[in-house]
Regions:
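Catalytic core of pol beta-like nucleotidyltransferases
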Residues: 1-21, 30-35, 45-105
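Short beta-strand->loop micro-motif that forms the acidic, two-metal-ion catalytic signature
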Residues: 40-43
């Protein structure tokens, strides 16, 4: 099964963050989304990403024109790699049950 993040959400997120990759996780990635479900994106950034790009507010700004429930969570590559080994973290869920929906060429 391949899940797809809506272009109306993914395109502005990629333009705003210029990430290494974007991982769809949660119910949409598992194929269990309902009409009331949100879209969860973990946005993996370079380790030298400016701190202002790593905030919850940056995630909101990136998805500002997408008018459906969505969580856009930015994370540095090194943080993702470290936390992806810790069960119960968002990084772990994204690494083990998520689907890469964008990867920088």
């Amino acid at each position: 099964m391949t899940a797809i993040a809506p272009a109306a959400l993914l395109d502005p997120v990629v333009a705003y963050f210029r990430p290494r990759r974007v991982i769809l996780f949660g119910s949409a990635a598992r194929g269990e989304a309902t009409p009331d479900s949100d879209i969860d994106l973990l946005v993996i950034l370079d380790d030298d990403a400016p701190p202002e790009k790593l905030t919850y507010r940056a995630g909101i700004e990136a998805r500002m024109d997408y008018h459906h429930p969505a969580d856009v969570i930015p994370c540095r590559e090194s943080t993702f790699r470290r936390k992806a080994r810790i069960a119960g973290t968002l990084a772990y869920e994204a690494a083990h049950a998520g689907q890469v929906v964008y990867e920088r060429p």
